[in-house]
Amino acid sequence: MATSLRELCKDRILNEMVRTITPEASNGWKALIVDQDSLRVISACCGMFDIMEEKVTVVEKIDNPRQRLPNLEAIYFLTPTAQSIDLLINDFKKKSSPHYLAIHLFLTSKLPEVEFKKLSASLAVHRIKTFKEINLEFLAIESQAFHLDQNNTLFQLFSPDSIDPTEEQAKIATRLVSLCVSLNECPIIRFSRSHPVSAMIAGFTQEKLDNVMRTVKSFKPNDDRSTLLILDRTQDPLAPLIHEFSYQAMVYDLFDIENDKFSFDTVTNAGATLKKDVLLGETDYMWSGLRHQHIADVSTNLTTRLDEFLKTNQVSQYGQHTGSLKEAGEVVRSLPQYQEMMGKYSVHINLADRASAKFPELEQLAYLEQDLATGEDANGNSPKNVTGRLSNYLSDFSAEKYNKIRLLMMYIISQDGIKEEDRRRLMEMAGISQSEQNAFTNLRYLGVTLMKGAKGKKPISPPKNRKSESGNVPYEVSRYVPVVKDIAENIINETLPSTDFPFVKEEPIARATNAPVSKVSLKGKSKQPRWADPNVQVEETKYSGSKLIIFVIGGMTFSEMRSIYELSSHYKKNIYIGSTNILLPKKYIDQLLTLKNE
């Protein structure tokens, strides 16, 4: 089992910050004051219960009106911005009426000199009992996935209209260093030559990491050095477009899920309809076990596990159902005495049922997408009648506009450009407006060749580690393998060419690792999913050996995240994937629209 990034960050927040402050005057009780960004850092890895359990009476945002608590000491966990420091100073501008008894100031990163001078000259400085920069500038969204909460990097780093990309590059590097410090790693850094931005950020990261090694004497990184590989969205511009039918990717693509919150209507036993909000995250063991499964497997596993639960808990008198998710949901509502467990089944039965209902209208589109993305059909042959199938879909008035845009973009990418007259004809057929066509022309800033025969730099592709996936996967609509997976596997097998993926510093001498590469099958041995029963304690050995960190500039997809989990499990290796942000298909197209207006 990989070392959990979320647990690591949670431990740091609790052990390096919250638990270190135990005011005697209030018997250990204190307040916690946060800003928007630091709150997101906490929320990614901690629940409010975890915080409140440590004698925190209240958690409040610094920019909100707050009641004065002059007899209580306060932990301020802030990002070191001018706004947050000004608000802190404002809490103590009147010597006779401070907001809190004392300040314990923890910053997500280094305090700029200008803000340090401002704070030093204020009345607040006399209340500071603790001052610490804890280097926590990323969101640990999953056990093996993180992002930097920078949602506009496609424009800032790839648009010709971006005013100062260097500032954004330096910010990314700083946040990557905070990740490395949290993992206790001083990694070997490599980057892709696919786009200059990867080299720039790799260089900045190396400089900042070297500075930490020189100046922070307490930082003692692991001897078995990890590898940090910096890639960018030009490596695989197709991955954010394709329909992915694993549970997590599908529900985020098809439904309006904001901040991991899924809202739906549920029917009570009394027949009333209630709106329910559910967080999709690793605190839900069912979600963790189901998220990377194909939606068809999710539906089957949910109904099978529900039947087993009913039998195990001797509630068979409620009757058997035929295996449909709708009937399973009715059974769930009839068991009020098992509310907690049934609540989890209810959420996922509802969500999986909605996702499954969408599949029939996407099925034929998915076959065409897979043929375009892989360059072959399900039998491993050259796909037939691609142009005809494409035209049929684009001219279908019932098809969604965004799906047409996604498909046509995939066609252009997969064909390495098309003729100008063909592009105009297909755009007109799909009903794509002049302004929407900007998204297509802006693909060139991600290295995509738009016109057949035009000269351009092709994205660097890694050596393939597997034969064609066609005929070797359970579902024909899931044949495409993200480029990130091939790259990561080449690093693990030490076959990634340094000409295309060079080292920032000299290539290290080959070293022995204490974690041999596993050659076991990718197919799991256990027939019972681990999420089936949270009370069953499963003995799992933590993976040892050097870590691998993959970072994608410009956004990562859920399919890429899933791929990293698969490799980590297969090779029994700590592998993490991160990015500037999560990239959903609609967001990707919307951001392409803004790269340049023509």
From Swiss-Prot:
GO terms for cellular component: plasma membrane; secretory granule. Disruption phenotype: Defects in locomotion. Involved in the vesicle trafficking. Binds syntaxins. One of its GO terms (biological process) is cell motility. It comes from Dictyostelium discoideum (Social amoeba). Pfam families: Sec1. PANTHER family: VESICLE PROTEIN SORTING-ASSOCIATED. GO terms for molecular function: syntaxin binding. It comes from the Eukaryota. This is Protein transport protein sec1. Belongs to the STXBP/unc-18/SEC1 family. InterPro entries: Sec-1-like_dom1 (IPR043154), Sec-1-like_dom3a (IPR043127), Sec1-like (IPR001619), Sec1-like_dom2 (IPR027482), Sec1-like_sf (IPR036045). Keywords: Protein transport, Transport. The keyword Transport applies. The keyword Transport applies.
